[in-house]
């Protein structure tokens, strides 16, 4: 018993609407209340959750967030909050540190890109927050949303994370959540890097991880990175990055959205319960017994080049990205430029 990762999107509220906002950046009227959030933390502790990630929207727009984090810390959960950081000052950073809560500060790129996508002054506010968190020893990661605008900024962004004293750097994928999907497609598709640009980024991050020799944890959240690793270092034994598949082997990952629904893969819309009504162990049992989850986890069911790819076992392509951009969750990952030797159109 025990879940490695529980992610709670506590609100979709934002200071204002921008490129990555959900539902116009307005909070949902039925988001979990303070008491319901505390019940979720109780349930998480009972279920043996190791890592609790709190995301948004902008989590710090919840007036009860610091109180909730302090409450959760009493259970010994490893806590992380992902934020733009605009509402972090010295006092907030100290309070987060006192609750042993690590902070992931998100930016959309270097200053010009970040200010273009998130508003003038956005970058400086986020970097100031990162510096304050670093001084408290709680800067877990500098997180960057992967768009076509950061393709040539990866090296400088990793360097910035190092300069800030961050434990890590992560590159996130632009994959819509299961709300306002059509609206998100309109906003996000034009921002996507091409498959070739994505390949360039992943190879650059591999080189940086070797050059920096463990000075910083570099995490590209992309299924294809396993293929890059295996190509560079064939002797490596790698585990697949698909949480759908991993949930069948162990209690790996669940995501709770602001309305309380629980997903094993939110972009696919695979909800298996509601924290207001369903215990987490019941939710996980539903995940494991789902015919669709088992079908998705069995890579023999994937279509196109992903099915015959020699890296199928450690990659298999992102099922969510296939679904969002092709309408078929079993289709080949449209973001991958790799062509298996046996593939013919």
What are these regions (language model features)?
Residues 32, 63, 121, 149-152, ...:
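Residue-level signal for the nucleotide or nucleotide-sugar donor/cofactor binding architecture
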Residues 1-99:
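Conserved alpha-helical substructure of the radical SAM core
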Residues 99, 106, 112-259, 263-278:
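Radical SAM enzyme [4Fe-4S]-AdoMet core and its adjacent flexible, acidic
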Residues 57, 108, 174, 314, ...:
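Flexible loop residues that form catalytic
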Residues 2, 17, 48-49, 99-100, ...:
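Short loop/turn motifs at secondary-structure junctions
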Residues 222-343:
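Accessory C-terminal segments flanking Radical SAM cores
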Residues 7, 53, 80, 104, ...:
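A structural signal for isolated positions on well-ordered beta-strands in alpha/beta enzyme cores
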């Amino acid at each position: 018993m025990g879940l490695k990762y529980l992610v709670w999107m506590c609100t979709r509220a934002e200071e204002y609407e921008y490129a990555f906002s959900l539902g116009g950046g307005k909070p949902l009227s039925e988001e979990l209340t303070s008491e319901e959030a505390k019940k979720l933390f109780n349930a998480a502790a009972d279920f043996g959750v190791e890592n609790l990630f709190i995301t948004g929207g902008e989590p710090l727009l919840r007036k009860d967030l610091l109180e909730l984090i302090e409450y959760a810390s009493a259970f010994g959960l490893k806590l992380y909050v992902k934020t733009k950081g605009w509402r972090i000052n010295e006092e907030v950073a100290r309070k987060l540190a006192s609750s042993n809560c690590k902070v992931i500060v998100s930016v959309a790129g270097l200053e010009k890109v970040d200010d273009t996508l998130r508003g003038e002054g956005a970058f400086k506010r986020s970097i100031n927050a990162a510096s304050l968190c670093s001084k408290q020893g709680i800067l877990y990661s500098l997180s960057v949303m992967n768009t076509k605008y950061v393709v040539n900024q990866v090296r400088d962004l990793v360097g910035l994370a190092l300069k800030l004293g961050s434990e890590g750097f992560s590159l996130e994928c632009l994959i819509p959540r299961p709300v306002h999907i059509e609206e998100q497609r309109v906003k996000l598709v034009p921002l996507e890097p091409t498959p070739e640009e994505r390949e360039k980024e992943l190879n650059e991050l591999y080189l940086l991880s070797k050059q920096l020799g463990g000075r910083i944890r570099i995490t590209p959240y992309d299924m294809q990175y396993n293929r890059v690793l295996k190509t560079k270092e064939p002797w490596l034994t790698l585990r697949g990055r698909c949480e759908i598949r991993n949930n069948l082997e162990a209690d790996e990952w669940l995501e709770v959205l602001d309305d309380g629904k629980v997903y094993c893969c939110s972009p696919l819309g695979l909800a298996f319960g509601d924290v207001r009504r369903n215990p987490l162990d019941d939710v996980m049992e539903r995940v494991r017994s789902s015919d669709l989850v088992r079908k998705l986890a069995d890579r023999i069911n994937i279509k196109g080049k992903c099915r015959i790819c020699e890296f199928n076992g450690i990659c298999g392509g992102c099922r969510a990205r296939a679904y969002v951009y092709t309408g078929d969750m079993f289709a080949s990952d449209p973001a991958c430029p790799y062509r298996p030797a046996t593939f013919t159109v």
